[in-house]
Amino acid sequence: MQAEAGGVPLLLRAPSRRRRGGLVIAFDPSPPEGREAFARALPFPSVGAWKAYLGLPLVGYRQPHGGVEEITRRQRSDYLLQLLDPALSDAVRDLAVVVSDLRKRLDLAPDAPLGLFGFSAGGLAALLALADRPIPIAAAVIVGAGPDAEAAVAAAERAFGITYQWTPAARVCAARLDFPARASNIARGTPALLVIRGADDEAVPATGIDRLHAALRPNYIHAPDRLRFETLTGIGHGLDELGKVAALADDWLSEHLTDW
């Protein structure tokens, strides 16, 4: 059902079963016409928790004033500082507000476990939430997200035919989005983390994901079963391919959120 929490529009799905009531937030980067399809592709049927599908700021059905033309202007003017970073930063701020509101409205315990799912830019938002950690996060699934701002900018250059001009301000911003460098922040409390890359995903370089894995692994030395990286064959970077990772994501979140 369509809902709102903390002033943020979202789709909300009740659990088919639940124990003490956790919550899964899925960051949705899909266009307006794909909003319902995103939620249908990721039902998380085994997870005994409420699911909230939260649109990313500045994209999809949360486009800025001016719509697609304004998004295009930002892409070409300064993709990182005017589009990507504001979208990710606002998403992390939204997360804390939405979770607080939903816990009150749905009568969830204050310490009910929180799981995240993010695809593409939504995956970057989930990684940033793990690194900044505005609220405790028990588990996360990241799909089709690069390891840092440089990879995201390179993908945008290929997709939109732009040449990005790196400025000192952009370099400062990129440091916050350098997730291998922030591995110790991401791993605080050893949240259960599953990272999935499609073998055919040209937007996410395998070398970058390997670097993220190498940076995170030492932080999970005492809990190796809580960190998993998977490369799946026959999967690229399309929203229409999320169904191919749905079962894996469902299993992971179910395993790590229902022990509570």
Q: Where would I find each of the regions flagged by the language model?
A:
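Acidic beta-to-alpha connecting loop that harbors the catalytic carboxylate
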Residues: S30, A199-D201, T233-G236
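Short, surface-exposed "cap/lid" segments of acyl-processing enzymes
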Residues: G6-E70
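The feature captures the conserved acid-bearing segment of alpha/beta-hydrolase catalytic domains
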Residues: A149-I221
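Alpha/beta-hydrolase active-site loop
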Residues: T72-L106
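Primarily recognizes the serine-hydrolase "nucleophile elbow" in alpha/beta-hydrolase
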Residues: V97-A159
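Short, flexible, mixed-charge acidic loops at enzyme active sites
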Residues: R62-S77, A155-A159
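C-terminal catalytic histidine-bearing segment of alpha/beta-hydrolase fold enzymes
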Residues: D210, P218-W260
